[in-house]
Every structure is written in C-alpha cells, then in structure tokens.
C-alpha cells in the first residue's frame, strides 16, 4: 500500500500533535475493513458502476447489486490516488494544497436548510434561500481563517422550481474568489457544473481540468451502500477532472456498530469503495478521504455533532487517511446548540481541536448550529476567531537559544518588566490576537456599550456585507455562465 510520504499515525505538522493509534491498530482497522469489503461487500445501485467493478475483477451479484472488492484492488487504488492536489481559487492567492500529512485547513459547514439570523437582539430561524448562499460566500471571502468555500445551505427558494443544485454552483463561484466545494451535487447535472467551470475559463476545458475552481462531495449510504447519485458523482467527477470527496455519515449505534472502532471499519469500507470506483474510472483521479461520521444518541434519537465522539472519530479518520496517503476532509468546529451561546463555544472548540491536532487536511463546520441543520453568519465570524486561536495553540512552544531568552532575562534582571525591550516591541503580534473575542477589563467593556459577542459579531457581519468587495467575474463570461444555469432551469421545467 502506497504511503505517499505519509507515515502511519503521524502528521507532518510542526507543533502539538495528537496520535490516536499505533501502527498495529491502524493495520487492524485496515484488515477488518478488507474482510468487510469481501463479506458482505458493498451494495452498488448504479449499473454503470457495477460494470466498472466487474470489468476490473470484482465479484458482482446482479440480483442483489452487491459488489465484493478484493484487497488487491484497494491497494492498487491507494497507489493511484494522488496524495497531493491543489484546489484553485478564482484568485490564485487562495489556492489551497490538500496533502496527506500536510497543513490543516478550514472551510464552512454544509449543507443546512435553515438560517439563524440575529434581529434586534434576538435570533430568528428561517428557511435558507439563494441570497443567503451569496451572502455567506462573500463573508467567507473576507474571513482570514476559512480557506475555501463549501456549500453552507440549500437554495430552498428554487426547490421544485428550477435546477436548484445548478444555482448552488454559480452563486458561490460568483460571490467568492476562493475555491468552491459543492456538498450537495446531483449526479445527472454534473455536466452543467463542468460547463459552468469551462465557461469561466473561456471554454478551455483543459485549463478547467488543470486549475479546478470547483469540487464535489458525495456520501455513501450507511451501512455499506453506494447510491446511483453517489456513483455518478464519483464517475463523472473523475472523468471531468474534478476533485471528489467520498464522505461517510455513519452513526455509531444506528447505521454502524456502537463501538467506535467498529464504526471506523464500516466507515472505512464505504469510503474506500468510493475511492476504488474513482480510480477504476480514471487512474489518478483526485479524491479526499471524508468523514461526517458521529454517534447516534440512543436516548435523544439524534446524531450529535458537538460531541467528543465526533471529535475523536474525525481525528481517527485523519489518521486513517494519513495511513493511506490520502488528503482528509472531516467534520469539526461543529455544534448541537441552536444559537450562538455558551454551549456553542464549548462544542466548537472541542470538535475543532481534536481533528486539528490529528492533522486533518480540511475541517468543515464553521458557521454550523443545530446538529448541522442551521447556519449562522454571526457564528461564522465567531468561529473565524476560534479557528485562529486553535491555530495558535497548534504551534506549540518553540525551544531554541533565541526563545529561551537568557540574555533578555539577564538584561532586565530582578523585579523589572520586559515591556521596554526592543524584542518585545518587535514581537507585538506574537501573542494570540482574536478579532471579536473581548479581552478588556469590565470597565472598558461597559464604557463601550456592554455588547455581548453576538451583537459584536452581527455588527461585523453587517459591515462586511456592506463594504467587502469580491473580485468580479468578467461580465461577458458571467453571462455565459448564467446561460448554462438558465439552460438547466429550462430542462428541469420540461422534464
């Protein structure tokens, strides 16, 4: 199995790290997964995908649609899948490298169906619409710590009226210069996505392949199923050169074993089956190893995402991805709380820290509330601060002759302070420096209006939406892109 410069259970991050498994434990998860891929196998609903598996040596039962994937095909797929690829932005300064064992990045959550809006000191929850996507894209374009944009909510105003998913493709691309990751693609419409990206590049399909400003996510159905839609997203994404994220959403105790190790086995089988399909379709296709796997709360009947288990599973998935030499994309910075409050801060910090310290390549969840059903722009800018502080903690403490600062200690001597030292003045930005989180004493805070964090965040959201400028797409090119959306709408209405 190709490790692609990634060492089992180890992240090449510099600073503080979290290692959950020994190499033997990772191998145990792998070999258990190989057993499951042969017995019972994976149910593959798509005839084209079953044919691809069959032509490459898999045992396929056409009555049950069950495919049994031998280990040699898994190993071959892992050797073919790239350990590194670049997510292009419309502005290349936002290009993001996804690399096994590489840097940790963050993106916003997706995909919710409601917006939590702050109005006159209170929160109101409403259905999400296309304009919300445009606003969140603009806000993410401004944020320092959101590296690329994932579809945060659905354009529910287009549900049943037009090609909703195609609107959800152009609107983000037009409203942020960062890379766009479509979390809710429709397999039969991937050609429209390709055409939109190709139109952005003036019709140059080769350039669109080399510099992908667009990528897609699909979810196997737990336990152990690949739907027609999932298969078509994988197959077409591979053929069109779009990075594809195979992300399991297993729930331990519900759609996977109650033991977290057993959940990792079914999770691994689901994700690897999708990755094998991608590599059988187009060797070298760009793929993530993805996770939104969590627990099933047997008492509440919900799938919590602000839980310690989600953080642990996401960290574990990061380690499995490193073991396989694949970039990872995992849930984190997540919350079950309904509004930005104390519970939210606790849940988000915990679920952000664990996968970050494990070296996940992308952590998605910023802006999310209510177990992933709701999105808040105020929470997004608060999460921007949380992520910044987590990044600072990840750096650890450097020990060197310079940082031990013996000369400075001797120069200042006993009972004095270090404020006047040139070294201190030069490193004024060395300590963590959140934008919104308030570190003043009570008197100064009260004198400035006694505003809580939600009010401050709302002011920042309002200011950014009013004043931040996103680099525009050329008018003629945008017209060509819009024409493709119009064509998709027409086809939807005629169908």
From Swiss-Prot:
GO terms under biological process: methanogenesis; methylation
Record EC number: 2.1.1.250
Alphabetical keyword list: Methanogenesis, Methyltransferase, Pyrrolysine, Transferase
Keyword Transferase listed: yes
One of the Pfam families matching this protein, by short name: MTTB
Top-level EC class: transferase
Coiled coil region boundaries: none
Catalytic activity, as annotated: Co(I)-[trimethylamine-specific corrinoid protein] + trimethylamine + H(+) = methyl-Co(III)-[trimethylamine-specific corrinoid protein] + dimethylamine
Keyword Heme in record: no
Pathway in which the depicted protein is active: One-carbon metabolism; methanogenesis from trimethylamine
InterPro entries according to UniProt: MttB-like_sf (IPR038601), MttB_Methanosar (IPR012740), MTTB_MeTrfase (IPR010426)
GO molecular function: trimethylamine methyltransferase activity
Assembly mode: Can form a complex with MttC.
Similarity annotation: Belongs to the trimethylamine methyltransferase family.
UniProt function note: Catalyzes the transfer of a methyl group from trimethylamine to the corrinoid cofactor of MttC.
Name of the protein: Trimethylamine methyltransferase MttB2
Organism: Methanosarcina acetivorans (strain ATCC 35395 / DSM 2834 / JCM 12185 / C2A)
Gene name as annotated: mttB2
């Amino acid at each position: 199995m190709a490790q692609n410069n990634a060492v089992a259970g180890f992240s090449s991050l510099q600073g503080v790290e979290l290692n959950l498994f020994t190499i033997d434990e990772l191998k145990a998860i792998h070999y258990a997964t190989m057993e499951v891929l042969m017995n019972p196998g994976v149910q593959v609903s798509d005839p084209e995908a079953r044919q691809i598996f069959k032509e490459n040596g898999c045992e396929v039962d056409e009555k049950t649609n069950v495919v049994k994937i031998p280990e040699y095909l898994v190993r071959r797929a892992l050797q073919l899948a790239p350990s590194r690829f670049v997510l292009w932005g419309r502005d290349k300064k936002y290009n993001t490298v996804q690399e096994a064992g590489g840097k940790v990045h963050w993106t916003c959550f997706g995909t919710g169906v409601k917006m939590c809006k702050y109005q006159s000191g209170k929160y109101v929850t409403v259905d999400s619409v296309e304009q919300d996507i445009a606003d969140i894209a603009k806000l993410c374009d401004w944020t320092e710590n959101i590296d690329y944009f994932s579809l945060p909510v659905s354009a529910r105003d287009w549900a049943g009226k037009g090609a909703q998913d195609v609107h959800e493709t152009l609107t983000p691309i037009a409203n942020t210069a960062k890379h766009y990751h479509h979390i809710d693609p429709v397999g039969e419409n991937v050609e429209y996505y390709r055409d939109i990206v190709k139109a952005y590049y003036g019709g140059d399909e080769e350039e669109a392949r080399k510099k992908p400003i667009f990528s897609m996510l699909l979810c196997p159905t737990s336990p152990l199923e690949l739907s027609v839609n999932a298969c078509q997203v994988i197959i077409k994404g591979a053929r069109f050169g779009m990075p594809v994220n195979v992300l399991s959403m297993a729930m331990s105790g519900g759609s996977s074993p109650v033991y977290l190790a057993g959940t990792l086995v079914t999770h691994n089988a689901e994700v690897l089956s999708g990755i094998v399909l991608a590599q059988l379709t187009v060797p070298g296709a760009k793929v993530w190893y993805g996770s939104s796997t969590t627990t099933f709360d047997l008492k509440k009947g919900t799938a919590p995402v602000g839980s310690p288990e989600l953080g642990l599973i996401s960290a574990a998935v990061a380690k499995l991805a490193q073991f396989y030499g694949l970039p990872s994309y995992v849930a984190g910075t997540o919350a079950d709380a309904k509004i930005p409050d104390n519970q939210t801060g606790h849940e988000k910090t915990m679920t952000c820290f664990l996968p970050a310290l494990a070296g996940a390549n992308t952590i998605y969840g910023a802006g999310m509330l209510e177990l992933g059903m709701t999105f808040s722009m105020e929470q997004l800018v608060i999460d921007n601060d949380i992520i910044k502080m987590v990044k600072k903690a990840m750096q650890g403490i450097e020990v060197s002759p310079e940082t031990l600062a013996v000369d400075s200690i001797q120069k200042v001597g006993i009972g004095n302070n270090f404020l006047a030292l040139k070294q201190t003045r030069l490193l004024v930005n060395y300590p963590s420096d959140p934008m919104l989180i308030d570190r003043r004493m009570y008197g100064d805070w009260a004198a400035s209006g006694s505003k809580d964090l939600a009010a401050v965040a709302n002011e920042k959201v309002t200011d950014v939406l009013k004043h931040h400028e996103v680099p525009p797409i050329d008018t003629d090119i945008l017209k060509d892109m819009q024409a493709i959306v119009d064509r998709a709408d027409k086809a939807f209405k005629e169908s």
